[in-house]
């Protein structure tokens, strides 16, 4: 049963991250988008990191987006699952800490940040492999 739980968590976390990335690149319809384009996302990133210079906040936004793309594909495929799940949890926790320090604790709950961190940590703890490249590559 745990292999199905892990598979579900991998799918849930990876598709959520890919959806957020798709939103940043305007791949979702405008009426359902949060940001709609990368410029809006970078402005949002700047609001979460007001103590950073704009150029550094923008770099952070791009780096986070790149990491989310890589991590979500790895989780989806089950490649280096334990490591990538821990890294994903750390990345999302950084997002949560930035939200907490800039807009408050409630926003982290509204965006289910800590649920996502918990899901990532759970993935990293579940050792049984199911539909993972890791089970083929040793």
Predicted segment positions?
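Extended, low-polarity transmembrane helix blocks
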Residues: 1-35, 47-66, 70, 77-138
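A glycine-rich, hydrophobic loop/mini-helix early in the fold
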Residues: 38-45
């Amino acid at each position: 049963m745990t292999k199905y739980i892990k598979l579900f968590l991998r799918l849930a976390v990876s598709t959520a991250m890919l959806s957020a990335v798709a939103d940043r690149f305007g791949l979702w319809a405008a009426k359902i988008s949060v940001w709609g384009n990368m410029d809006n996302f970078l402005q949002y990133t700047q609001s979460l990191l007001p103590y950073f210079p704009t150029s550094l906040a923008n770099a952070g936004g791009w780096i986070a987006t790149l990491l989310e793309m890589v991590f979500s594909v790895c989780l989806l495929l089950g490649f280096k699952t334990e490591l990538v799940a821990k890294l994903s949890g750390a990345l999302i926790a950084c997002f949560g800490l930035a939200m907490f320090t800039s807009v408050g604790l409630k926003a982290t709950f509204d965006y289910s940040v800590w649920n996502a961190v918990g899901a990532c940590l759970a993935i990293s703890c579940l050792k049984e492999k199911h539909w993972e490249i890791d089970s083929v590559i040793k």
